[in-house]
From Swiss-Prot:
It comes from Eremothecium gossypii (strain ATCC 10895 / CBS 109.51 / FGSC 9923 / NRRL Y-1056) (Yeast). This is Diphthine methyl ester synthase. InterPro entries: 4pyrrol_Mease, 4pyrrol_Methylase_sf, 4pyrrole_Mease_sub1, 4pyrrole_Mease_sub2, Dphthn_synthase. One of its GO terms (molecular function) is diphthine methyl ester synthase activity. It is found in: Cytoplasm. Belongs to the diphthine synthase family. HAMAP family: Diphthine_synth. GO terms for biological process: methylation; protein histidyl modification to diphthamide.
Amino acid sequence: MLFLVGLGLSSHEDITVRGLNAVKRCARVYLEHYTSILMTASKEELEGFYGKPVVLADREMVESGCEEILRDADKEDVAFLVVGDPFGATTHTDLVLRAKKQGIVVEVVHNASVMNAVGSCGLQLYNFGQTISMVFFTDSWRPDSWYDKVLENRRIGLHTLVLLDIKVKEQSPENLARGRLIFEPPRYMSISQCCEQLLEVEEKRGQQAYTPDTPCVAISRLGAPTQHMKSGSIHELAEYDAGEPLHSLVILGRQCHELELEYLLEFSEDQERFKDQVHRDQEFFKPAPWVPPPEDED
């Protein structure tokens, strides 16, 4: 059997009882190690907690060499551990499909992820629209397809969760081209860099999906003991040092409820200014007043 086990957001102790029991019965344990990280638990701590070795599964192993993970899973139990919830990435869905095609039984053990824990910032989950990912820009690659999703969300008044890029066990273009197994140090996108890229793309696209004054909430180390929130405009957060990773950002939608705003004010250094930013932003995509159709003179 293949177990996909969610680990939660921060600590080795965030695993559920059901998930821990599944891991302990498995012959092999793999930890997916490229879409996210456990902020307060090392590989060695996990091995001590589970009482067995843990193999780090990088992007290449999961996407290209998944046969190693699925090896003998029809005869013995194998665990594939995922930070957050198992279905937070499409590659995990692909792994399940491959297992089922081989006749391997799959069991999923869910856990908390950024997709639901983001509610701890005070915004109501059913007021969120499409989630986007912000990747590190390079000199030759500055994707902006996510911009249209933000625009759609904002037009219908919904919040946008922005997931920030991480780079773990990545190769430089030169080392990749030369076939050298030399990897770059891990990198984690910061709130400030995300906001700078947001402003750059708005200047390029010019459709006013948002402005420098659009209110947001910056979320640092969600689910960890050092979790921190800060409310402010995109321009203000572009100069904000959010500290250690991991970081996320929420761009507020027009339909910001009074209770949501009251909660967000607790994270603002200048509450009156932030409240004014929210109220002005609510007018930004305000629908035109309804005009009844002309009556038929006949």
